[in-house]
Amino acid sequence: LGEAEFLDSVRHFRDKIENPDLKQQVKGFIGQEAHHSRQHQFVNSELDRLGYRTDKIEKDLKKEIAKLVAKQTKQFRLAYTVCSEHITAIMAEYALNEPAFLEGMDAPMKDLLLWHSVEEIEHKSVAFDVYMEVVGDVKYLNKTMKIAIIIMHLHFTQRMFKLAFNTKHWANFREFAGFMSWMFGKGGMWRSLRQPYKSFYKKGFHPWDNGGLELVEKWQREYAQPEQNKASTEYQMGHPA
């Protein structure tokens, strides 16, 4: 659902792009995000199978996106996509930099998230470059980011509460509190993202200032080999013959 809105927000400005290289990057971005949408459907079906109720979250998300489309300008929607892509990219970079983040996860799901993280990094500058070429208002973009980060924190917490208390897996509050501490507490993911998040506001900022290509190259060397993990018991359990 989120990917569909990201795509629409960029498509609205597609005809105004003059840079031929950027036009090609937008084409690739659209293809990747469409594929991500299908992968999210797969993940949601797996979560449903495990007892997590993702249908309620999807229903709420549809309403949120409908309100955004109805009430906000095309400029705001593109700016919001830029902000979302930045936050998603720094989360992806964190996942690739911190092996413990995915520790204990089943091999097929871990491989999927690593792959998804790599693709988020690969196209992390596309929406930003489109915005800068067709709009170029940095002050507006920075204001949008301040709104976006608050909304994302609120929505993330809200959705985790819904997942936690609509499934038997998180029946006790202690387990849920531990997860929230892991995400938001000292040494948690969100605190670790402070510096890369703040870099967004630096004068002359560009998404590639934070690097990231080295993580993509490392993944391609170490993980992008389908045969590599097939010998593991975890992989075989997730991919029955």
List each model region and its residues.
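Non-heme di-metal
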Residues: 1-241
